[in-house]
Regions:
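A domain-level signal for the structural core that forms small-molecule/cofactor-binding pockets
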Residues: 1-163
Length: 163
């Protein structure tokens, strides 16, 4: 189907959370309505409570409300907080960066510490070149992803705010 609409290489993932070795329905993610609400994946929180406390028009932001979500495996909660921590770490510790945006994309069925994409956008101070900072930024992103469980620990211990 994709070849009808693009000449680009397309990779399709279907039912990646299913367990093909299962001998009964417990290994498959099946719903009657087609929504996650029947499987306990729903959040009981509105969309106004941003992880960083801000509603930022004309800037990248997530509509995900982090409060009330599972701090162990809800990527909307974890990646929102993780993105903020990465951005703070980079801006505080890498000379020459004024601002930073971090975007992390999950993939169903993959471990949380292995996102489909982790993308950064930096706004540099005058005279600073991307090649002066890119390796340092990449190292900080990698370090946070390797130790992503600290996000859960900090939320559970009340050290990290979710709004």
């Amino acid at each position: 189907l994709a070849t009808k609409y693009t000449n680009r290489e397309v990779e399709v993932f279907v039912n990646t959370a299913d367990n093909d070795d299962a001998t009964d329905e417990s290994g498959y993610y099946l719903t009657v309505t087609g929504t996650s609400a029947e499987m306990g994946d729903d959040g009981s929180v509105g969309r106004g409570n941003r992880a960083n406390g801000l509603i930022t028009p004309c800037r990248p932001m997530s509509m995900e409300a982090s409060s009330g979500k599972n701090p162990i495996n809800h990527v909307g909660k974890i990646y929102n907080i993780l993105s903020n921590e990465i951005a703070k770490d980079v801006v505080e510790n890498v000379e020459g960066i004024k601002q930073m945006n971090v975007m992390i994309l999950s993939q169903i069925g993959k471990p949380i510490d292995q996102p489909k994409a982790a993308s950064t956008q930096v706004i540099l101070e005058d005279g600073v070149k991307l090649e002066d900072v890119d390796k340092k930024v990449e190292q900080i992103v990698d370090r946070w992803l390797e130790d992503i469980s600290i996000i859960t620990e900090n939320v559970v211990q009340g050290k990290t705010r979710t709004f």
